[in-house]
């Protein structure tokens, strides 16, 4: 999948386009769109207490937690004490947006992931909710 055109685009809080810039979730939304697996956009989770972030994400976004990284999936990290997400573009590498460098590629192991997710379609998300 093509993503070279996204590299070095500046960081922008709540950014969702190449023209305005991206935040980490914005780049994940863009990559999922390009992959044909749209990721629901969410409001600014930085305003939520840390204890509620995972519940909000797992309940409001079309993702499913998985045990290991998967190309086309998401990796969750903490960066400077805040929730951060990257899109897994190839084995061992994520594309993500940082405040100081904008959109970059980083080896997953440097980021020390705390969770991995796959993006699921709406019918799978509804099925998962019913199973709970």
Stretch-by-stretch model annotation:
Residues 1, 131-132:
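Short intrinsically disordered terminal tails
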Residues 4-16:
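A glycine-biased structural micro-motif
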Residues 17-35:
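Active-site nucleophilic cysteine motif
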Residues 3-4, 21:
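Onset of an N-terminal alpha helix
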Residues 1-2, 80:
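Absolute protein N-terminus
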Residues 40-111, 120, 125, 129-130:
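...with weaker cross-activation on analogous glycine-rich loops/strands in unrelated enzymes
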């Amino acid at each position: 999948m093509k993503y070279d055109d996204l590299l070095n685009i500046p960081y922008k809080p709540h950014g969702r386009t190449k023209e305005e810039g991206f935040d980490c979730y914005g780049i994940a939304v863009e990559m999922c769109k390009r992959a044909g697996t749209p990721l629901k956009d969410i409001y600014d989770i930085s305003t939520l207490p840390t204890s509620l972030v995972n519940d909000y994400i797992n309940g409001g976004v079309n993702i499913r937690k998985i045990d290991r990284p998967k190309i086309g999936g998401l990796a969750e990290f903490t960066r400077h004490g805040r929730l951060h997400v990257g899109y897994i573009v190839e084995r061992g590498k994520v594309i993500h947006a940082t405040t100081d460098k904008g959109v970059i590629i980083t080896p997953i192991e440097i980021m020390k992931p705390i969770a991995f997710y796959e993006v699921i379609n709406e019918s799978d998300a509804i099925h998962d909710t019913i199973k709970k």
